[in-house]
Each structure stands twice: as C-alpha cells, then as structure tokens.
C-alpha cells in the first residue's frame, strides 16, 4: 500500500469501526506513530497531540463510540454528509445518491452497506484510502473536493467540541490537520455547498 494511503486508512477505521473490534484495538498502538506516516506541515503539533493522547477504558470508549457514531437517542454530531448537506438533515438524500454514483463510477460498490449511508465520514476516508492505494490520485482528490471537504470540516469542528468523548475530540483535531494539509498540498478546491447543520 502506498504511504499516502496509510493515514486515511487508519483515521477512517477509527471513525468508522467500533473500538471493540480487535483490528481497531490494534490501531490504538499506532497512535504515537501518526506523525511519521504523513508529511505534516506542522509535525511538532501532531507529535504533541499524539504524545498526550489518552485512551479511556474499553467500556467507556465503546459507549462513546456508540453515542457519537451509532446513535443512542439524539446524536450530538452525526457522521453522515447528507445531514449537513440536505435541507431537512435527512440520511440517504440526494447528496448520498450523488456520492454513491461517484463510487460506482470508480468501481466501488458497498453491497453490505444497505442499512448505512456510504457518506459516513470514516467510510469516506476509507474509500479515499482505497483510491490512493490504487494510484488513482485524481479520483481521490475528486472524492475530497466534491463529497467530503464541503461538509467535513464542519463535522470535525463539532466533534472537536463534543462533550461525550475527549478521545474522539482529539481524533477530530488530528483529522482536521490531515485534511487541511492534504487540501493545501494537493491544491484542492472544495465545492462550495450550503450547510444545514
């Protein structure tokens, strides 16, 4: 896997999969190495974030993930793009259909995702990682410009200020730094879309 694909794969997995999964638990050991996995503009800042990153106990982190990503009652920070981009904050709206069409045009079909929209933040990072792993930088950049960046920074801003989980707030800070660096380094021009959340 190309080095450019590694960090979005790790971040995507942390945003998408439950911390109960053994493969996600293994990623926690990688957190101190994140500064080495990407040519950060401010590596010292990332080193500081990762060095002081504390993990709650397993049960607490599982509960936090459930509240923030699966929903227990009203979700404080929904992780789906359509909530931010659709006027009525609906899941599986027109923006999700547009993103699904983009994925299909790249040969990416999520047949086992029938119950969850493809525009979940972590799942989008995983798709970006797959495109980078295939060497398709143009499609990866298009995914970011048209589908993730128009709402992603708003989502990450809200997640940084959540009162449920300091761990996921820190993850949002690191992901924000990553996406800002990618945007600057690749010269990306995100589509300007109105946000409703």
Regions found by a protein language model. Give the residues of each.
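Charged, alpha-helix-forming regions
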Residues: 1-197
